[in-house]
């Protein structure tokens, strides 16, 4: 048998254990026709990222599920991998180049990509090694990257299929533009922040009547791109202006007044300015009225100038403009200013010209980039889009039919809201790091060719000069294919794809249901004909101890690796799930980490005690039932119940409840009670009693370690290996299940009567400050004496009884006796010689006053007809029970006071 160190030191165990798992190949999974598959694909963290608490909770939950299923006999596959993270990675590389005095353009696309791949190689393994420190039992032989050869093949296959089906198109549409990242982003990537702003009330003169039309805007810098003013055709205030024009202030340009339902008669003056190039609603108005689209912002957030206009004019002159191609304005004196600089200058000029009537402060939601938090500029830009309506419909139906369920169920609504309100997905990004769009343009005739590999000639004109689209695909485009691209798709003959797909459970945060979950669902259905998983298990975010979101600005982030270095990975893992509820945010608590570490130490010490009491020739195995005493059957029944309950909890993704159950069983049942109960038997001199106690101790410990293993894998492996008869690894051992043969309900109930009585006696002695060495006789009044008679050795050891008398009804003198009561027994214990009478009377009188106060409070509630009639029946019953218990408590206190004279 292996000898354990006196103290548990995770730093001496965890790395060694993990390497042994890797060397043993225990994480690797292959198709096995004799086993049922269970598959999880890891939400791929950014390749340049570092482990944070979100990763820690996400991967701990996945590891718990995988380890459990592996022990339950499944071919449990957990596919790991990382995401290329276009925007984030490109920003990191650009920042590093800037420090060298370089830009992307200076080194060119190929040179930049060489640097990006070098960056990925240098930093890409960092988060993988950190996930290993956490204990993640992924199949690292199958590690994937969203830009590896297989994923790239899948991306090109999907793009070409969708294009051929008419579901991918390129056009000038309104997009969300980030001037800092210098790329478009999708609707789902826009975060909204409440900010202070203003409504600037402007005056536009009507050419035909000379009157002033008042309108309000939060973005006066866009007015240079106004191509109309809208009124509602039903608004009687402006009926006389139908067909008229306004003169655009500052530019002195005539633009039409159009009648459109977008102008709300009930809001403000009912007049709105229309800037089709820089507002999504205005863009739609522009399409309805065939208005010019005039862009006044550059893509890096400045006002357009002469050079910008010349480039656009040349495009139009060459006939290369496409539908909804924006014209570009030379903004003159404002050209080159940032949008905020232009706002100040334009407002000053409007005020000077008498066109600024009023400034109205307001709070409003401003769209920001989810990556850099810069303000998003709506822009009409030529981009690639996916038509969402045909793809969203089956994805909605799949969830409605129950093919995919969300846990907790309430997140189904989040998913449905997103899917039912989704717009066409802008998938092109003006970045170099990522999957370059597989589309080429003929330099001779302008034909667009979409193909999985570079075409040699133009199919339209035969030209040989073709240029690939410089844009890359949205990162989420490749991530959407993750559940099946990692298993061999588009090779539908892939053995892994046939066996492990569809996957089973997706574990992820609620913040990316729109970004990622929804896209995986419609992608799986569209390209494989199957839902990619059957369950989406949602977890919340980890907040700090004050309930605040962890952020760099607050400086309240917690580094999981620092926690692991201090307390061990097991303690961090257990803290993250113990008592947690699916879908709810959780608070990081160092106190809870310390408690988890203490739990590990408690288990370590308990195992050392058991091992020290085993003879060298000990062979594990439960003795026959006739050799088991009441306490053995009690602990085996408790173990049985915990195994059944935990299995049910984990089947329903209630990891917090499962963790709490095994914690309570090991700490309260096994360590605090059963080990203590076993000690007298181990030292009794009765060989059979000692052997039975040892066998039950080892059997229960073995099962408890297996139940705890998914939560605390390192310490359970180390302790399991120390047990006699252990196998190569705990992680491939059978998961304990409910066993009807080990369910002794009568013995459990009987022994708990004894336990309750012992607890009551010990509590009383503690309150009276009676030293354990001071023992006394006792009389036990009970209608069922058998459990107590069978447990006299425990009464002597733990209730400090010298001798015990049993009676159904005690009618003797109670002078000098203290009474303790439980639901099954009442004890009469002579304590006068063991206590300080005056101190005890003072304590009892204090307890009496407290009990009288409780009794009065519950009585007042029950005497209130309105409470009894209107409160929930369960609450009223609960108050009645508390009232009855308070009555019994007060009666016992009064009897004890009387006994003390």
Predicted stretch roles:
Residues 1-234, 275-288, 292-311, 343, ...:
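N-terminal, positively charged nucleic-acid-binding surface of large information/translation enzymes
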Residues 34-42, 64, 100-103, 128-135, ...:
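Active-site-adjacent bridging/hinge elements
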Residues 6, 81-84, 112-117, 141-152, ...:
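Conserved short loop/turn motifs at secondary-structure junctions
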Residues 54-66, 73, 82-83, 151-154, ...:
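Structured ligand/cofactor/substrate-binding pocket environments in proteins
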Residues 181, 251, 372, 443-445, ...:
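Short Cys/His-rich metal-coordination motifs, predominantly Zn2+-binding knuckles/fingers
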Residues 201, 417-477, 481, 526-569, ...:
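Feature 926 captures the class I aminoacyl-tRNA synthetase adenylation module centered on the KMSKS loop
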Residues 1-4, 43-51, 109-113, 138-145, ...:
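Glycine- and acidic
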Residues 67-75, 96-109, 129, 133-138, ...:
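Secondary-structure transition/capping motifs at alpha-helix termini
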């Amino acid at each position: 048998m292996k000898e354990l160190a006196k103290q548990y030191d995770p730093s001496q165990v965890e790395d060694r254990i993990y390497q042994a798992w890797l060397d043993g190949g225990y994480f690797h999974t292959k198709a096995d026709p004799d086993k049922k598959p269970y598959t999880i694909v890891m939400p791929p963290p950014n390749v340049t990222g570092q482990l944070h608490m979100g990763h820690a909770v996400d991967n701990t939950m996945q590891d718990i599920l995988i380890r459990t299923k592996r022990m339950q006999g499944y071919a449990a596959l957990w596919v790991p991998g990382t995401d290329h993270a276009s925007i984030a990675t490109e920003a990191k590389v650009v920042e590093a180049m800037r420090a060298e005095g370089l830009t992307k353009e200076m080194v060119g696309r190929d040179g930049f990509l060489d640097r990006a791949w070098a960056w990925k190689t240098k930093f890409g393994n960092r988060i993988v090694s950190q996930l290993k420190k956490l204990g993640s039992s992924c199949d690292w032989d199958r590690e994937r990257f969203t830009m590896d050869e297989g994923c790239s093949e899948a991306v090109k296959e999907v793009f070409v299929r969708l294009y051929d089906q008419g579901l991918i198109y390129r056009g000038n549409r309104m997009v969300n533009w980030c001037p800092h990242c210098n790329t478009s982003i999708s609707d789902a990537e826009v975060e909204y922040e409440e900010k202070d702003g203003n409504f600037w009330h402007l005056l536009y003169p009507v050419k035909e009547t000379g009157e002033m039309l008042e309108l309000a805007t939060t973005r006066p810098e866009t007015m240079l791109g106004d191509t109309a003013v809208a009124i509602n055709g039903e608004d009687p205030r402006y009926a006389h202006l139908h067909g008229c024009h306004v003169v655009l202030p500052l530019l002195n340009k005539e633009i039409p007044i159009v009648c459109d339902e977008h102008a709300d008669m009930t809001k403000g003056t009912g007049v709105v300015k229309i800037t089709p190039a820089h507002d999504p609603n205005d863009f739609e108005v522009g399409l309805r009225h065939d208005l010019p689209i005039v862009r006044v912002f550059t893509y890096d957030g400045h006002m357009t100038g002469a050079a910008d206009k010349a480039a656009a004019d040349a495009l139009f002159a060459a006939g290369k403009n496409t539908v909804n191609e924006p014209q570009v304005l030379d903004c003159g004196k404002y050209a080159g200013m940032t949008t905020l600089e232009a706002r100040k200058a334009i407002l000053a000029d409007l005020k000077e010209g008498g066109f600024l009537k009023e400034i109205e402060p307001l709070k409003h939601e401003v769209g920001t980039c989810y990556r850099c938090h810069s303000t998003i500029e709506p822009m009409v830009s030529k981009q690639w889009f996916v038509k969402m309506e045909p793809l969203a419909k089956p994805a909605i139906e799949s969830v409605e039919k129950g093919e995919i369920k969300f846990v907790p169920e309430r997140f189904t609504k989040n998913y449905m809201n997103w899917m039912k309100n989704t717009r066409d997905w802008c998938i092109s990004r003006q970045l170099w790091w990522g999957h370059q769009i597989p589309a080429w343009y003929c330099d001779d005739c302008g034909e667009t060719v979409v193909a999985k590999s570079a075409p040699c000639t133009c199919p339209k004109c035969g030209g040989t000069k073709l240029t690939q689209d410089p844009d890359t695909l949205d990162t989420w485009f490749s991530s959407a294919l993750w559940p099946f691209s990692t298993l061999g798709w588009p090779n539908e003959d892939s053995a892994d794809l046939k066996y492990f797909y569809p996957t089973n459970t997706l574990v992820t945060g609620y913040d990316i249901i729109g970004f990622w979950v929804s896209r995986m669902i419609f992608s799986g259905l569209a390209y494989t004909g199957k839902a990619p998983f059957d369950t989406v298990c949602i977890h919340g975010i980890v907040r700090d101890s004050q309930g605040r979101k962890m952020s760099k600005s607050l400086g309240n982030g917690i580094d999981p690796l620092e926690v692991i270095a201090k307390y061990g990975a097991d303690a961090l893992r257990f803290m993250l799930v113990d008592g947690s509820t699916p879908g709810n945010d959780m608070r990081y608590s160092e106190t809870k980490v310390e408690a988890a570490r203490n739990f590990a130490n408690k288990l370590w010490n308990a195992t050392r005690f058991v091992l020290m009491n085993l003879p060298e020739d000990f062979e594990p195995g439960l003795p026959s039932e006739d050799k088991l005493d009441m306490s053995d059957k009690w602990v085996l029944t408790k173990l049985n119940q915990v195994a059944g309950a935990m299995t049910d909890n984990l089947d329903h993704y209630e990891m917090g409840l499962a963790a709490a159950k095994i914690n309570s069983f090991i700490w309260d049942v096994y360590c605090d009670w059963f080990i203590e109960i076993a000690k007298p038997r181990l030292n009794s001199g009765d060989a059979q009693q000692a052997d039975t106690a040892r066998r039950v101790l080892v059997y229960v410990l073995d099962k408890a370690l297996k139940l705890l293993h998914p939560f605390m894998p390192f310490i359970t492996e180390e302790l399991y290996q120390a047990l006699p008869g252990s196998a190569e690894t705990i992680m491939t051992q059978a998961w304990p299940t409910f066993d009807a043969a080990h369910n002794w309900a009568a013995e459990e109930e009987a022994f708990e009567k004894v336990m309750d009585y012992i607890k009551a006696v010990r509590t009383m002695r503690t309150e009276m400050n009676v030293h354990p060495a001071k023992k006394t006789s006792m009389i036990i009044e009970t209608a069922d004496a058998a459990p107590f008679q069978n447990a006299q050795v425990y009464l002597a050891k733990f209730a400090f009884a010298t001798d015990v008398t049993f009676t159904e009804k005690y009618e003797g003198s109670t002078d000098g006796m203290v009474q303790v009561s439980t639901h099954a027994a009442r004890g009469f214990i002579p304590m006068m010689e063991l206590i300080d009478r005056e101190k005890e009377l003072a304590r009892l009188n204090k307890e009496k006053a407290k009990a009288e106060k409780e009794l009065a409070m519950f009585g007042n509630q029950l005497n209130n007809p309105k409470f009894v009639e209107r409160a929930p029946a369960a609450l009223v019953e609960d108050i009645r029970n508390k009232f009855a218990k308070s009555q019994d408590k007060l009666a016992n206190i009064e009897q004890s006071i009387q006994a003390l004279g």
